[in-house]
Amino acid sequence: MEFEQVLTEARLVRRYRRFLADVEDASGQQWTVHCPNTGSMLGCTEPGARVWLSHSTRPGRKYAQTWELVELPGEVVVGVHTGRANALVGEALDAGLLPELSGYASRRREVRVPDAPMRADWLLEGHPGGEPPCFVEVKNVTAAVEHGRALFPDAVTERGRRHLEVLTEWVRGGGRAALVFCVQRSDAQEVRPAEAIDPRYADALRAAAAEGVEIRAVRLHPSATGIRPDCALPVHYQEEP
């Protein structure tokens, strides 16, 4: 994924009210931008961190710029825009990084799971080998701890847990479903549930995997020019201390 424009570089002052962040340029001038991430953004909101912003020309928009990237210590760049995760997983599918989900002739976005209060991010259809259609839910991952362990979620997510339960019920009924963690940081080596943050989600993830929901993860490499698919990552179901 290439960014449509040259991103503006700034420094983070603070992130607040979930959807807002204040930034400043080298001269000290400050302004407010849109923060497209509803999580806690654990580890990604240190004041003074280098950030990159995209610009919208849409008329009437209150905040013209959107926070896209943040640089962490060690020159690790993290993509914080959760709205890009679905398209990035689509690119990862095209790049062959999720071979277990390959072979489908088409895919559709935002498709309702039958008899369930949920729209899946993707529906894969038309597998020549006879595989059933596959509902795919995408979760954006930005948090990580030492040794490259990426964690999800970074805040309690009742919605995310309900999505897992819907996918689990779909598989129990004979369907196919997958959850893909979209890890937008190049230092990640694996993905684990953040048990200390949301133990109910961790339990639901393990239950879903045991019932046959396919749990996958893909690493993306963010930079100031774009975000490219990198590699598949292993998923482990226990958070190590």
From Swiss-Prot:
| Domain of life the protein comes from | Bacteria
| GO MF annotations, alphabetized | DNA binding
Report the Pfam families cross-referenced here.
SfsA, SfsA_N
Question: What InterPro entries is this protein classified in?
Answer: SfsA (IPR005224), SfsA_C (IPR040452), SfsA_N (IPR041465)
What family does this belong to?
Belongs to the SfsA family.
User: This chain belongs to which protein, by name?
Assistant: Sugar fermentation stimulation protein homolog
Provenance organism: Halorhodospira halophila (strain DSM 244 / SL1)
